[in-house]
């Protein structure tokens, strides 16, 4: 269970860092740039801890999939990014795929 918490912290760090990239204006603004570097540092550190017991394929699928959906949602809410019907369908498929990997696949670490 602890390793799944590490993975959640890793996803949080990656989402914060990726979301701050837009505000950093190509690393020309100090505070958002520091958030980007710190967020990715946090993300990869905790991902490495999670990989001690979660298979890399599962961990990366969860990390990348949920990261994509959360970053898109944040961009939609805070930056006014337009998402159409098919974007929501695609995000739903990503979440469904992550759920299938974790709930039904025999390669998942439970």
From Swiss-Prot:
**Pfam families attached here?**
Multi_Drug_Res
| Topology within the bilayer | Multi-pass membrane protein
InterPro entries given in the database record: Small_drug/metabolite_transptr, Small_multidrug_res
Q: What is its main location?
A: membrane
Gene Ontology cellular component annotations, sorted alphabetically: plasma membrane
Alphabetical keyword list: Cell membrane, Membrane, Plasmid, Transmembrane, Transmembrane helix, Transport, Transposable element
Superkingdom of source: Bacteria
State if Oxidoreductase is listed as a keyword.
no
Return one GO MF term.
transmembrane transporter activity
Q: Where in the cell is it found?
A: Cell membrane
The entry's function note states:
Multidrug exporter. Is implicated for the resistance to bacteriocidal quaternary ammonium compounds.
- State the family named in the UniProt similarity comment for this chain: Belongs to the drug/metabolite transporter (DMT) superfamily. Small multidrug resistance (SMR) (TC 2.A.7.1) family.
Classification via PANTHER family: MULTIDRUG TRANSPORTER EMRE, SMR FAMILY PROTON-DEPENDENT DRUG EFFLUX TRANSPORTER SUGE
Q: What is this protein called?
A: Quaternary ammonium compound-resistance protein QacF
Q: Which organism is it from?
A: Klebsiella aerogenes (Enterobacter aerogenes)
Organism lineage: Bacteria, Pseudomonadati, Pseudomonadota, Gammaproteobacteria, Enterobacterales
């Amino acid at each position: 269970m602890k390793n799944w918490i590490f993975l959640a912290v890793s996803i949080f760090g990656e989402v914060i860092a990726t979301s701050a990239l837009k505000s950093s204006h190509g690393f020309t603004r100090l505070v958002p740039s520091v958030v980007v570097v710190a967020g990715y540092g946090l993300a990869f550190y905790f991902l490495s801890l999670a990989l001690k017991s979660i298979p890399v394929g599962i961990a990366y699928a969860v990390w990348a999939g949920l990261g994509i959906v959360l970053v898109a949602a944040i961009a939609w809410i805070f930056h006014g990014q337009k998402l159409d019907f098919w974007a929501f369908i695609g995000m739903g498929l990503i979440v469904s795929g992550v759920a299938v990997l974790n709930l039904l696949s025999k390669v998942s670490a439970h």
